[in-house]
Amino acid sequence: MNASPSTIVAIATAAGTGGIGIVRLSGPQSVQIAAALGIAGLQSRHARYARFRDAQGEVIDDGIAVWFPAPHSFTGEEVVELQGHGSPVLLRQLVARCIALGARQARAGEFSERAFLNGKLDLAQAEAIADLIAAGDLRAARAARRSLDGVFSRRVDAVSESLTRLRIHVEAAIDFADEPLDTLGGAQVREELTRTRALLAQLLRDAERGRKLRDGLHAVLIGPPNAGKSSLLNALAGSDRAIVTDVAGTTRDTLHEAIQLDGFELTLVDTAGLREGGDAIEREGMRRARAELQRADLALIVLDARDPQAARDALGDAIDAVPRRLWIHNKCDLLAVAGPMDADAIAVSAVTGQGLEHLHTRLRELALGDGIESVDGEFSARTRHVDALHRAEQHADAADLELRYEQLELAAEELRLAHEALGEITGKLSADDLLGKIFSSFCIGK
């Protein structure tokens, strides 16, 4: 255990009023501070009714106190939770009294940080706590719960253990450099590395899916002015989120709206119409539209169904940045007769609703069917996890190449770097500044 000398305190429930509010203490003085509040006779993991008193003996609040002795607590330290009424005034007064008795205000994420430092959970699990709290839909919440339960970490550990075995074999071969690699089990090393690279590649694919589950997909509505992008966003969102007029260039800024697709969050981004010219404000809107495209997972290209080819030509190469695209011919209700349709386009009318069900189906297929389908054991992941796995994969591939030419020292270094990248995910090889950045994004009471 990495015991901390100080005792910390914070409100553990969400901001605002509620039926119940919780103040959490963690550290060696937790029980003594509780006693000074007037809470005597605490028993391990037993709820005890008490009145919480100030320095003059006046009652601050009454409620339940629970003691979790070390190391059998969330943080691994002595923990006392004070459960009273959810009044921010009373909770702040209770925290102030605890501070007067020797505790200090906890930093953001400090309870989870202590749990990590005391070996109660690893870094990926600690991050999953924040992801679980912030989950925007049920699937994201379930994925975060699996990461908190260690599903992601165990798979990282499995690859890490395989890399450890490989490093042992390669380092041993370096010590016996006069012997050919094949006489030292070179074939088995290459076979193990091939298997490890396959595990790593699959883990990377699953982590990419986990990142999308956590962050959702960003779909940018792009197209020329007056193609009906804002009307389409309103139709998909089921509310009038964007201003709609007959004047081309009405949309000047980006507008984000989240919708749910079978329990998966898709963020729609309405953007300014792309065209030549325009005033300074409209040109800034078009610049922002192109910037959104650079970050998009999916481009919804909205064209006027009455002349889609001309609208396509007006876009130029703006959509080349997004590999996944869905062509939408809007305003199909204004066609006197059905015109020629591109094979890859969907005809809709944002005004009448024609074709919207087909569009919803196609969006679900793109969002859920391409690497986002529901699978057993899916877990939550973050961009930093995906980045670390990418680097681990690159180093493992480089190690394979070095082994082919029997460059053992170079192969050993590449394996070490791959191992180090994996260690960043669970926190086994993380710099202090990285830990500080991660935990500072947590809630104060976590």
Swiss-Prot record:
PROSITE patterns: G_TRME (PS51709). GTP binds at residues 226-231, 245-251, 270-273. Belongs to the TRAFAC class TrmE-Era-EngA-EngB-Septin-like GTPase superfamily. TrmE GTPase family. Its EC number is 3.6.-.-. K(+) binds at N226, T245, V247, T250. (6S)-5-formyl-5,6,7,8-tetrahydrofolate binds at R24, E81, K120, K446. Keywords: Cytoplasm, GTP-binding, Hydrolase, Magnesium, Metal-binding, Nucleotide-binding, Potassium, tRNA processing. Its main location: cytoplasm. This is tRNA modification GTPase MnmE. It is found in: Cytoplasm. The lineage of its organism: Bacteria, Pseudomonadati, Pseudomonadota, Gammaproteobacteria, Lysobacterales. SUPFAM superfamilies: P-loop containing nucleoside triphosphate hydrolases. Binds 1 potassium ion per subunit. Homodimer. Heterotetramer of two MnmE and two MnmG subunits. It comes from Xanthomonas campestris pv. campestris (strain B100). Its cofactor is K(+). The keyword Glycosyltransferase does not apply. Mg(2+) binds at S230, T251. One of its GO terms (molecular function) is GTPase activity. GO terms for cellular component: cytosol. GO terms for biological process: tRNA methylation; tRNA wobble uridine modification. InterPro entries: G_TrmE, GTP-bd, GTP-bd_TrmE_N, GTPase_MnmE, MnmE_dom2, MnmE_helical, P-loop_NTPase, Small_GTP-bd. Residues 216-368 form the TrmE-type G domain. It is an enzyme of class 3 (hydrolase). Exhibits a very high intrinsic GTPase hydrolysis rate. Involved in the addition of a carboxymethylaminomethyl (cmnm) group at the wobble position (U34) of certain tRNAs, forming tRNA-cmnm(5)s(2)U34.
